[in-house]
Amino acid sequence: MIRCVSLAIARVLVFEMIVAGSVAAEPGQWPRWRGPDDSGSTATGNPPVRWNPEQVVWKRRLPGKGCSTPILWNDRIYVTAPADGRDALLALDPSGERLWQTAFGSENPGKHRNGSGCNPSPATDGAGLFVYFKSGTLAAVAFDGKIRWQTNLVERFGPDTLFWDHGTSPVLTERFVIMTRMHKGESWVAAFDKGTGEMVWKTPRNYETPVEGDHGYATPLVIQHEGSEALMVWGAQHLTIHDLGDGRVVWTCGGFNPEGNELWPSIATPVVIDGMAVVAFGRNDRGNPRLHGIRLGGSGDVTATHRAWLRTDIGTFVPSPVAYRGRVYLVGDQGRVACIDPATGRSDWEDAFPKGSAKFYASPLIAGGRLHAPREDGVVFVAEIHDGFRLVANNAMGESIIGSPVPSGDRLYLRGVDHLYCVGSR
């Protein structure tokens, strides 16, 4: 990593590259599921390492089972959950008191044991809130809970054919809220006007793949491409970059599954760091991982020219990678941990969390210089990662955790399937 560049400057550069179209997030804000720069990390704050009942600042029961990640904006916590058979968005204050609850249409419950009808996380641009649910409801909501507009993408474009539960979260640009659908059938990327909900463009995105290879659950990223704001989409075994004006594909990279493996959906969201997209693919959960380093830049089909490196010995199936201080960190589905140089793909170090029968579904977080990784059984591991790996805590929450942890100063928010927790300083 380049240690001579100050952390403050590095964070600004990453922010400018990735967060085009969003308002600048102050420390403690977490406007979407992987944070203000989509890295899954923060350089500010110092959330707790170990906690006991006295350090659980509050615990609030949610109205139904959910797997989305909360977001934070201006001392408010926003989280989706089903309520009385309907999709809902909740707002809480820092004490955990519910300020309002807004309901939409009927819930479409999850099929997977670790899925729900509200896997996608909310997003905010500082002017309003945007939500999407498995039922197809896409909505814009004011900070007082009033619905500005809503539409149903299942009613408009038909149901998805995903084997499991929709997980892609809304993506915000200066003008648009963007949604994607990657499945067997008509797959697409669509942009909707943030103010009115009117669809501005819809671009087909269809590729022939082996069985389930065209199923996608990852969330797109807004990046800077050749000097312009663009959208990077991972799914159907292709990485594509789209012009935000009309949705057309301006860059594409394939070659992710030349062996034709079946049952390889796209789940983990890539990270972008130092001009490289790091893409976790394959079936790490079945001992067949893939980790790709793809150089960005250029135009057209770059499959033959921009594939920088490939690892076949390490990866992650569900948890998304984290970018932090010039390195990419992986937490595999069974707890293997690695710190990787994105330029070469080589590991600085590898280690593992304690083995157990449960797997990792939540995407990890780096905050306070430490790695926070919830396991599906509710154990939240915390490890020091400076100059190697050192496990420092395992905190048992007592309920399953699928949503990713969210930092805010000296606090950490954890979304269990039934409760929302705040741990840290009071």
Predicted regions and their residues:
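N-terminal secretory signal peptides that target proteins for export/translocation
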Residues: 1-8
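Sequence-pattern detector for short linear motifs
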Residues: 6, 14, 35-37
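Bacterial N-terminal signal peptides
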Residues: 8-20
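Noncatalytic, solvent-exposed loop/strand surfaces
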Residues: 24-426
